[in-house]
A protein has these predicted regions:
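Basic- and aromatic-enriched surface patches that contact anionic nucleotides/nucleic acids
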Residues: 2-44, 58-188
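A short, surface-exposed helix-loop junction/capping segment
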Residues: 51-58
């Protein structure tokens, strides 16, 4: 997505003579946000990451930041059937999904499924503290694998500047990106 995105933006910049676009300035005929929503199980999401269908390391995203406690609480929330916020991804021309919002959540799931951390400081399911995915009771493994995430996909035909605008809007409300992370968005 990175090279094709830059090619699309550069081609448009060459045509307009502008370096940066405001989404309102994009010609109306290409200013369409095309999305599709899916309900994906945790098991499916982990498999998609393993197969390279979801990119957990896009250039424009920050590194993994969550401490084990926060990641553990996400796992506990899934086991307790607590709704998890929507994950937003942008589809590229190869049909790969690049994470726009939800990278920390997906990374936490993936790391847990790969036994990279033990559950810690759980508040409700405290009997699971100290366990990795491998050591979870079979019922808990099934419940976790069957947990559902809503995924909103910005389809490949969506103009790159519209995708960028969505990224900016989603990532200016919670933990703010630093200036370098925001600049990296331009080169995704």
């Amino acid at each position: 997505m990175n090279e094709s995105y830059l090619d699309d933006v550069n081609d448009y910049d060459d045509q307009t003579g502008e370096d940066e676009l405001d989404p309102v300035e994009i010609p109306k005929e290409v200013r369409h946000l095309r999305t599709q929503s899916y309900d994906k199980s945790v098991r499916d999401l982990v498999a998609m990451i393993d197969e390279g269908d979801i990119d957990l390391d896009p250039d424009y995203q920050r590194n993994y930041l969550w401490e084990n406690k926060k990641a553990s609480l996400l796992i506990e929330s899934i086991l307790l059937n607590i709704p998890i916020p929507v994950v937003y991804v942008a589809e590229n021309e190869e049909s790969q999904w690049n994470v726009i919002d939800g990278l920390q959540r997906l990374n936490s799931l993936y790391r847990f499924f790969k036994n990279e951390f033990k559950l810690s400081r759980l508040e409700v399911l405290s009997e699971l503290n100290g366990l990795t995915y491998h050591n979870l009771p079979p019922k808990a493994k099934r419940m976790l694998g069957n947990g559902m995430f809503r995924v909103v996909v910005l389809l490949a035909e969506t103009h790159p500047e519209i995708k960028y605008d969505v990224f900016m809007r989603l990532n200016t409300g919670s933990v703010r990106l630093n200036e370098q992370e925001l600049r990296n968005c331009l080169y995704r």
